[in-house]
Amino acid sequence: MALLGASFQIGRSALAAYQSAIAITGQNIANVGNPNYARLSGRLTALEGGMTLSGIAPGGGVNLSGLQRHVDAAVEARLRMSASLRAGSQATYDVLSQVESLYNELSNYDLSTQLSTFFNGFSELQNDPDEITARNLVLDQADAVIGTLRRQRAALLRQATDLDAAVREGAQRANQIATEIASLNEEIVTQDARGPGFSAPLRDRRDALLRELSELMDIQVRERDNGAINVYVGSEPLVEFNHSRGLEVQTELSDGLSRATVRFADNHGTVVMSTGRLAAQIQARDEHLVGQLQSLDQLARGLIYEVNRVHSTGCGLVGYTNITGTYAVNNRQAALNSAAAGLDFPVNNGTFIVHLRNRSSGETITRQIEVDLDGIGTDTSLESLAQQLDGVPNLTAGVTADGRLQLSAGSGYEFWFSEDSSGALAALGVGTFFTGTDAASIDVNSTLRSDARLLAASLTGEAADGENAGRLAILGTQSSALLSNQGIQDFQARMVNTVASAAATAATAQEAADAVHSGLMAQREAISGVSLDEEAINLTTYERAYQAAARYFDILNILSTEVLNLVSTR
């Protein structure tokens, strides 16, 4: 009977082991559609048993000694790295493709076409300088350029603001993930102490969170002996066992823009990220968007200055009777080229000529005005410049309370300027075409809007003279010191080409990252994924084993009955 007892133990162990194996297979099948699930399998091991009457020891049955969770740590680490690169390249491409779409090149409404139309308008004005319609057309074409510059700048600012919001949202989610991982660490250690398999669902959840976190930022994971993990961003720990340092977002003002930065909540230290969606969004904002904003402002600044420089040295169908500069100085006694003066545009050592004409007689006098900025002796300030101009007969000059040059002709006189080698007229906004200093503030001078006759198409002030309009017409292709010695149209084309090239590079990087990630996902699926075909085979195997064990029990019951009958008949 003792031997039958051992046989019963073998049967009981088989029923228990294969019942558990069937349950594991069922769990795998139930989670076949769960992308975060890692396949489980039981480890069946033979039990030792006593010796039979024949002198052999067949064993004591079978035991499900452990539960294996099929995860390759190396593949998971590479998968997290590829997820970070993939999310980062996608974010970069999204930003650049939006900028590329914003510029809307190869259409009739892109900036390059509008700039060409604007400068061509001056060519048409040169051919018919006395025609008001041609003058109004130039002003309309200028408004088209201005509208596009403003719209593009506003769109870039909105995009930068949207990226800031995305960084805040991403950092908030990363903080939630880090907190949950710290909590899961503690739960996993507790569940592991209960026995094999208790922590498997928690580990699945933790691995899924790590993959999500890796999309936001590049992380390194180190598992501790107790099953908990530490998470690092760069060389800084983010999660250590059951403690998360936390993440926060701080706002910094730089280049006139509000920028969100990600920091550790405990010491406010900067979180150094090299890949991932957050790193890409921050980099795209700071390099691409801010860079494009600066380039757009530089383009507008160059356009304003170069057109104003030429326009201020020409004459319209009528001269000025009074004029107030559009740009003010901070200090009227400071040299015009000094930081204290605070002018936005350059002024050089040179001269310009003022022309004063009697409207009745046509008699014109000219005076050369010195702009002494050679750094020797007393350099020209706005105040001293006004004094020089005030010395011209029938011309009154002064400085307004807010630091702008103001000129008025005597009764019956008009004036204009020519041959300005100093750039002072353009820098002070005297006789200019544009106002403003960047893509946000650029506009057509209100004096031209009020009277298109003041558009300076002439150099001499004589009828049918369109020479200055011709000078304005070729500005689009002439190099400008304010545009890194490129022409206005070349500078704009290079801006667009830079974005297009960066977008193409980002698209290639995205495709490469997608390919690598897909390959690693396939590897993970082969290791951790559930195959219904394999599980069906396992289920059949375990089912038959269980049935055989049950049949084995039936046989043991029959033998037991026969033994008892033999004993009772004696």
Which positions does each model-derived feature cover?
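Structural signature of extracellular appendage/secretion-system components
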Residues: 1-570
